[in-house]
Amino acid sequence: IAPARSASDIDEAVLARAQTALESLSLKVSFSQYAFSRSQRGCPTDVEKVDDLHAAFLDPNVKGVLAAIGGVNSNQLLGRIDWDIIRANPKIFAGFSDITVLNHAILAKTGLVTFATPNFYCFGLPPKADYSLEYFRCCLFAGQPETYRVRASKVFYDYAWDYDEKS
């Protein structure tokens, strides 16, 4: 889903690499109805974002919800979200950046533990993608969090918005 910026802001090659990376974990990747939508603000409307969030939690075939990209305005969704839908249909919710407000709100309103993970696009950005994918797998698929130790990444980027093919 794209609860902040539109997934259409992500370079197509990065999208393809991210999808391939997540599929290497035997995940079936699908995109929400409005993930690539662009309103006058350049992203899905708040109604579209919330519709996608609700649809993802209501769909029994969806096992986890991963934000496409961070951005702005996720806080504007809080008053529109039906927390009972999320509470009644618990599943993995993951992302970071502007998505952090949703991580915290979901925990506060429903008790569902969420995950501060790379957003979808991050898994398509080499050389960071390998490190991110390794710990995404460990965190979500390898048992209890205390069963693995996080090592420092050898790659660090000190600039914002490194989500395109040139990065």
Model region roles, listed by residue range:
Residues 62-68, 90-93:
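A short, small-residue-rich loop immediately preceding and capping a beta-strand
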Residues 45-54, 107, 115, 132:
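Cofactor- and metal-binding active-site motifs of prokaryotic enzymes
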Residues 81-106, 113-120:
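Short, acidic/small-residue loops that bind anionic groups at enzyme active sites
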Residues 77-78, 105-108, 126-129:
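Short acidic, glycine/serine/threonine-rich loops at helix termini
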Residues 111-167:
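Conserved anion/nucleotide-ligand pocket segment
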Residues 1-61:
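ATP/NTP phosphate-donor binding region
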Residues 66-75, 80, 96:
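N-terminal glycine-rich "phosphate-gripper" loop used for MgATP/nucleotide binding
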